[in-house]
């Protein structure tokens, strides 16, 4: 006998684009306005907190790729949706949005980090591709090896700087907020600072764009495959089609680290902007 069909909303969004990022924050931080500005979504915006009731996906365009941004319901000191952990499972990072004009914004940062820690979700300062000198190292003995914890590299977005004209200095902001998260002063009202998010995500997540071509034809330069730094020709072949990956013999590559049309093996590491022509057995 089959079980009953599951009913109710699905709180996990299937990842699309180069990476999925979760947008989290306290009520009235302007995170839904930020999501709408960045993605053109129809995220509901209201004067009162808790306007967002379910995950709202949207796509942030950066050059020839896109990042998927998921606007999640706000986190309050006395309430957080029970399905929040499930919603964060596919995410590769987070944008923590606070209202810099709110005197309690420092407490909000600590509160949200604490509430998520209770659910074994760690908002961490370190991004793989950002300067390690500007980031706090992770205690690898006590944290990084914990298989039951979700680690999300986090960008702190100090929103509503249009309401606090002294908030443009990121160093002063970081000192004021008492955090080592990478920090961006921004405004979802006039867009100040928001054009920096795409480049930061691209660098921080070590995204590599790889273009493919068919023998005898020009490369397909409008829709790159996206992988992480250190990925190989075989990794890209798996994205193209599992049968191609299974019968891959070699590839010809064009890029800054190879001669034009150089023959490379399946384990050849790829760089951003490389073009590959896959050859099968």
Which functions belong to the PLM regions below?
Residues 37-38, 82-85, 109-112, 169-173, ...:
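Short, glycine/charged-enriched secondary-structure capping and boundary segments
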Residues 60, 69, 112, 210-212, ...:
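Generic structural hydrophobic/aromatic packing signal, biased to beta-strands
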Residues 59-64, 100, 104-108, 113, ...:
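A short, terminal or domain-edge coil/loop segment
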Residues 75-77, 89-139, 161-167, 191:
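Conserved Switch II/interswitch segment of TRAFAC-class P-loop GTPases
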Residues 1-19, 24, 29, 125-281:
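C-terminal-of-GTPase-core extension/linker across diverse P-loop GTPases
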Residues 1-106, 114:
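Conserved G1/Walker A P-loop phosphate-binding module
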């Amino acid at each position: 006998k089959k079980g009953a069909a599951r009913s109710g909303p699905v709180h996990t969004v299937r990842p699309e684009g180069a990476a999925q990022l979760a947008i989290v924050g306290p009520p009235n931080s302007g995170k839904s306005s930020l999501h709408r500005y960045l993605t053109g979504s129809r995220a509901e915006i209201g004067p009162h907190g808790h306007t967002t009731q379910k995950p709202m996906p949207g796509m942030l365009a950066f050059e020839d790729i896109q990042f998927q941004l998921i606007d999640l319901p706000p986190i309050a000191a006395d309430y957080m949706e029970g399905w929040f952990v499930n919603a964060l499972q596919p995410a590769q990072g987070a944008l923590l949005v606070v209202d810099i004009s709110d005197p309690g914004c420092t407490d909000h940062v600590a509160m949200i980090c604490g509430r998520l820690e209770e659910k074994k979700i760690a908002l961490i300062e370190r991004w793989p591709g950002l300067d390690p000198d500007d980031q706090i190292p992770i205690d690898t003995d006590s944290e990084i090896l914990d298989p039951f914890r979700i680690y999300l590299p986090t960008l702190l977005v100090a929103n509503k700087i249009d309401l606090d004209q002294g908030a443009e200095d990121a160093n002063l902001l970081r000192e004021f907020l008492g955090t080592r998260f990478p920090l961006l002063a921004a405004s979802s009202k006039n867009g100040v600072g928001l054009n920096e998010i795409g480049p930061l995500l691209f660098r921080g997540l070590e995204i590599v764009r790889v273009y493919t071509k068919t023998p005898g034809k020009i490369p397909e330069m409008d829709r790159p495959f996206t992988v992480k730094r250190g990925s190989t020709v075989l990794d890209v072949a798996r994205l193209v089609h599992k049968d191609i990956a299974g019968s891959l013999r070699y590839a010809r590559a064009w890029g800054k680290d190879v001669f034009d049309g150089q023959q490379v093996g399946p384990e050849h590491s790829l760089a951003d902007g490389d073009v590959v022509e896959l050859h099968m057995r």
